Structure formats: structure tokens, C-alpha cells
């Protein structure tokens, strides 16, 4: 049984997309669609989470993810508490579980957790009270499920269906928790061909076992693609130099207008952010007509609203 689901199939935690059935992913995306108009209203709120307390526990820096979770929770009328790690008892050596236990004693209903250690969100989920839900907002290299979901939502909005697409994920797959979540979601939702493109040093050993095709050449990898997802170099997770220089990387694996022309004419370009312009993507592409990078950010609010609403409301998946 999947620990993220209750015995009757309801979402209890969101820790990873690996192992979640297609019906669950589709239901989250459908629920997100129903929240898309909230941001366009004069009063950008719905009362679904009124009286609920949501704690953002970000042990790693974040701009888009933390902010969109906060906006999403407030649009659901929840009370949001952002824990400032720099001034918290964590800096005094308090164990993460003690931090969580103390916050639980303050009648928390949900924890949004980002941590540098893979498995941190799973660890917390195993120790919280039954009424508390945990959302993994990124744990080490392991997973970033809400980013994976908002990327699927973006693809569905621009491409309609998944069953006839070729999707390429380009760059530092080895250190990317986003890539792992994207691959699990794409294969679960029925994308027939998922490609990863990058230098051998930045692709995990045995990545083919996840059901992807591997390319070390941009021209071959981008040919005929409907969706191109660029990843940044995760310099903060690298142990020692793996590349000669950022300029060298851009030469071979940076997405330029010339390289994008190898994909289908109506291909869309995505990036989970933050972008390193001139390293993995040229500004002409990032700001160009095929880029859907800013819509990704907008859609992230609706997707995170959907996740929190399903967790707190217990809507069947």
C-alpha cells in the first residue's frame, strides 16, 4: 500500500510522484484546473481551508516554491506560518523531529517541507499525528512532486494530451530532484517517449531503467520533440568540478534558437527555475514565443492549491 494514500484511496501526504496511480495525478490536475479562475477574481480567495494552520518549513533557500505555496494557502483561506530557519532553534542544534513535534503542539494541520537531505519529508511524515499532512517541497536530489505536477499541468494546458508527445529533459539530471519527479509523472501519464539529454557526467547511472531514452547530443535528442524542459546546473549539489566551464556547457547543451529549431515548430520550452541565462538557456529562447516559463509559475499556484485542498479536505483521488 502506498503510504501517501489512505486505505480508501484518499491523499494523505504528497512525498513523491513515484508509485502514485495515473488516476490520482489526473485528479490533482483536474482539481487545479478548477482553481485557475481564483486568481482572476476581485477577491482572490475561497474558504476551503479556513481555520487550517499550514507551516512552511524551508530548510533550503527558495523563492518561487515557498512564495507560491504561501499564496496558494492564503487563497484557500488557511492561516500560514513561515518558519525562519535562520532565526529558529534549528540554528541552536535542535533536531528536526523536535522542531516538528513542537510545531505540531501548536495545532498544525499541514507541513510544507523543503530540505537538503533526501528523505526528510518522508521521515517527518512517518512521525506526525494522523491528522497532519506533509507535502514534500523538495528533498535533496530525490523528489519535488509539486514541481512535477505543475509541469504536467503546463504540458496539458498547451498540448492537450500526453499520449502522443515526445518530451526531452535537458541538462543536469544527476542532481535534479525535479527531473526525477517529471520522469515519474510523464511515464505514469502515458507519454510514449521521454528523453534525457546531457553529458555523461550529469546523467545518473542506469537512468534508462526509469523508461527514458538517453542522448548525449542535442541535435539528435531534440529532433521531433514537442516539449523541451531545461534544467539548471545544480552547482550547490556537485562534489568537485564536472564541467570545464559554463561557456563550454552552453556551447554543447545550452538551448539556443538554432538548437530549438531542431524540435517541432510548435514545441514549447519549459524551465523549473531559477534560470541561468547563458548557461543552460539563451535569453532569446527564455523570452521567446515558444517559452512557457512564466505560465509555469502562474500554474504552480493552482496546482499547489489543489494539492493542499485534497490533503486537507480529503477529496477522493
Swiss-Prot record:
Top-level class of the enzyme under EC nomenclature: transferase
Report the family membership: Belongs to the aspartate/ornithine carbamoyltransferase superfamily. ATCase family.
Q: What's the name of its gene?
A: pyrB
Which residues are L-aspartate-binding? Answer: 92, 177, 232
* Name of this protein: Aspartate carbamoyltransferase catalytic subunit
One GO term (biological process): 'de novo' UMP biosynthetic process
Q: Which GO terms describe its molecular function?
A: amino acid binding; aspartate carbamoyltransferase activity
Pfam families annotated for this entry? OTCace, OTCace_N
Query: Which residues are recorded as binding carbamoyl phosphate?
Result: 64-65, 114, 144, 147, 273-274
Record's subunit section = Heterododecamer (2C3:3R2) of six catalytic PyrB chains organized as two trimers (C3), and six regulatory PyrI chains organized as three dimers (R2).
InterPro entries, per database record: Asp/Orn_carbamoyltranf_P-bd, Asp/Orn_carbamoylTrfase, Asp/Orn_carbamoylTrfase_sf, Asp_carbamoyltransf, Asp_carbamoyltransf_Asp/Orn-bd
GO CC annotation: cytosol
Instruction: State if Transferase is listed as a keyword.
Output: yes
Which transformation does this protein catalyse, written as a reaction?
carbamoyl phosphate + L-aspartate = N-carbamoyl-L-aspartate + phosphate + H(+)
What job does the chain carry out? Catalyzes the condensation of carbamoyl phosphate and aspartate to form carbamoyl aspartate and inorganic phosphate, the committed step in the de novo pyrimidine nucleotide biosynthesis pathway.
The EC number of this protein is 2.1.3.2
Keywords recorded for this protein, A-Z: Pyrimidine biosynthesis, Transferase
Source superkingdom: Bacteria
The metabolic or biological pathway listed in the UniProt record of this protein is:
Pyrimidine metabolism; UMP biosynthesis via de novo pathway; (S)-dihydroorotate from bicarbonate: step 2/3
Amino acid at each position: 500500500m502506498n503510504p501517501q494514500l489512505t486505505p480508501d484511496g484518499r491523499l494523505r501526504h504528497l512525498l513523491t510522484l513515484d508509485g502514485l496511480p495515473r488516476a490520482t495525478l489526473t485528479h490533482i490536475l483536474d482539481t487545479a484546473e478548477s482553481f485557475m479562475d481564483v486568481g482572476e477574481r476581485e477577491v482572490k480567495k475561497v474558504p476551503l481551508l479556513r481555520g487550517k494552520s499550514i507551516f512552511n518549513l524551508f530548510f533550503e533557500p527558495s523563492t518561487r516554491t515557498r512564495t507560491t505555496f504561501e499564496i496558494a494557502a492564503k487563497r484557500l483561506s488557511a492561516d500560514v506560518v513561515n518558519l525562519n530557519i535562520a532565526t529558529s532553534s534549528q540554528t541552536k542544534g535542535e533536531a528536526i523531529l523536535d522542531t516538528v513535534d513542537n510545531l505540531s503542539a501548536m495545532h498544525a494541520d499541514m507541513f510544507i517541507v523543503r530540505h537538503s537531505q533526501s528523505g526528510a519529508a518522508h521521515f517527518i511524515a512517518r512521525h506526525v499525528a494522523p491528522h497532519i499532512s506533509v507535502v514534500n517541497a523538495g528533498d535533496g536530489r530525490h523528489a519535488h512532486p509539486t514541481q512535477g505536477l505543475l509541469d504536467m499541468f503546463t504540458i496539458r494546458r498547451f498540448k492537450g494530451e500526453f499520449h502522443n508527445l515526445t518530451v526531452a529533459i535537458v541538462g543536469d539530471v544527476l542532481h535534479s530532484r525535479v527531473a526525477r519527479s517529471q520522469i515519474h509523472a510523464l511515464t505514469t501519464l502515458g507519454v510514449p517517449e521521454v528523453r534525457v539529454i546531457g553529458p555523461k557526467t550529469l546523467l545518473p547511472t542506469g537512468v534508462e531503467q526509469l523508461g527514458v531514452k538517453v542522448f548525449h547530443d542535442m541535435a539528435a535528442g531534440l529532433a521531433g520533440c514537442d516539449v523541451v524542459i531545461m534544467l539548471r546546473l545544480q552547482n550547490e549539489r556537485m562534489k568537485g568540478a564536472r564541467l570545464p566551464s559554463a561557456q563550454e556547457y552552453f556551447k554543447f547543451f545550452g538551448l539556443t534558437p538554432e538548437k530549438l529549431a531542431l524540435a517541432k515548430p510548435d514545441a514549447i520550452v519549459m524551465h523549473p527555475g531559477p534560470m541561468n541565462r547563458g548557461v543552460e538557456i539563451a535569453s532569446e529562447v527564455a523570452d521567446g514565443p515558444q517559452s512557457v516559463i512564466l505560465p509555469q509559475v502562474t500554474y504552480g499556484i493552482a496546482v499547489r492549491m489543489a494539492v493542499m485542498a485534497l490533503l486537507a479536505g480529503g477529496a477522493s483521488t
